[in-house]
Structure formats: structure tokens, C-alpha cells
A protein has these predicted regions:
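Hydrophobic core residues within well-ordered beta-strands of beta-rich domains
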Residues: 17-19, 103, 117
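HotDog/MaoC-like acyl-thioester-processing domains
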Residues: 66, 98-101, 108-154
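Hydrophobic beta-strand-centered segment that forms part of the acyl-chain substrate-binding groove
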Residues: 66-104
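Residues located in well-ordered beta-strands
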Residues: 19-22, 86, 91, 106-108, ...
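Beta-strand-rich interaction surfaces with strong enrichment in secreted/lumenal proteins
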Residues: 8, 34, 92-96
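A conserved, well-ordered hydrophobic junction motif at loop->secondary-structure transitions
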Residues: 36-72
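Catalytic strand-loop segment that frames the active site of acyl-thioester-processing enzymes
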Residues: 15-51
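Short Pro/Gly-enriched beta-strand edge/turn motifs at strand-loop
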Residues: 1-7, 101-105
Length: 154
């Protein structure tokens, strides 16, 4: 297995909003990341020592972003800015993730066309699937991103 760069190099995010702790494996259409449930997560509730399960959608989305960032780095490009357009059929077998748990997050590209992509994603805890969903994402071209920035300033 190839040693991957730190997650900070794969994501177009800054701390504290980097929620994925590391990428373990990246292939042509797949990624495997891990998330440590701990106090460093901005969604960590200190009273219950948990992170709400709905944050799992963001764990999956950031794993997809890390996949995109890795493939950009392989082309000597910066990790691109992308947008989560939606998630479909998010299901979770729990209400929250507990401190000390290490979540394995897997995502697989189902289709891609003109910057739009669909990924099937899941979260596992000790080999058991605890959450699943489908993510619809968009990575605009540099020109389209610039156009979007100009429009937002008007």
C-alpha cells in the first residue's frame, strides 16, 4: 500500500472543519478513510461524548473530496473546490458515534459526467456497516468557479 499524504493536503478545507482524520487507500474509483471520534471534532458533544450520526454525511462527503484531492495531486494540481449537491437515502444504525470509536469510511464512484458525480458511500465500525448513502457532487471547472464567484458578488 502506498503511503498517502496527510489529509490536510487532500482537502480544500482548513481546520477545524477537516473532519476526516486520514486516508488509508485510494484507487481509481474508490477511497477508504478513517475518522476518530474525539474532542477535536467540532461536532463533538462533551456532555454525551458523542458526535451525532447525521455528521456521517459530512464524513462521507469529505472522503469523496479527499478522493478528488488525491487524484488532483497526482496531476500536480491543488485539491479542487467541490460542492455536495445532495445526499440520498442516508440511513444510520445509530443516533450518534461515541468517543473512542474509529470509523472506516468508504466511497465508490458510481458515475461521473462533466464535473457531476455520484458516489455510493458507507461507514463501518469494526467491520459492521453503520451508515450508508448516495452522494451527488459537483466539481466546477476553474472557469465555471470564477463565474460563480463573480455572480455571488453582484
Amino acid at each position: 500500500m502506498t503511503k498517502l499524504p496527510p489529509i490536510e493536503q487532500l482537502l480544500p478545507h482548513d481546520k477545524p472543519m477537516i473532519l476526516v482524520d486520514r486516508a488509508l487507500d485510494v484507487q481509481q474509483d474508490t477511497i477508504h478513510c478513517q475518522v476518530d471520534i474525539a474532542e477535536h471534532n467540532p461536532f463533538f458533544y462533551s456532555a454525551s461524548h458523542t458526535v451525532p450520526a447525521y455528521v456521517g454525511i459530512e464524513f462521507m462527503a469529505q472522503s469523496v473530496a479527499a478522493w478528488s484531492g488525491y487524484h488532483a495531486l497526482m496531476k500536480e494540481q491543488a485539491p479542487p473546490i467541490g460542492f455536495l449537491l445532495g445526499s440520498r437515502r442516508y440511513t444510520s444504525e445509530c443516533d450518534a458515534f461515541s468517543r473512542g470509536q474509529v470509523l472506516d469510511v468508504y466511497a465508490e464512484k458510481v458515475m461521473e459526467d462533466n464535473g457531476m458525480a455520484v458516489f455510493s458511500a458507507r461507514i463501518e465500525l469494526q467491520g459492521t456497516v453503520v451508515a450508508t448513502c448516495q452522494l451527488n457532487v459537483y466539481v466546477p471547472s476553474k472557469e465555471k468557479l470564477q463565474e460563480m464567484k463573480i455572480r455571488s458578488q453582484q
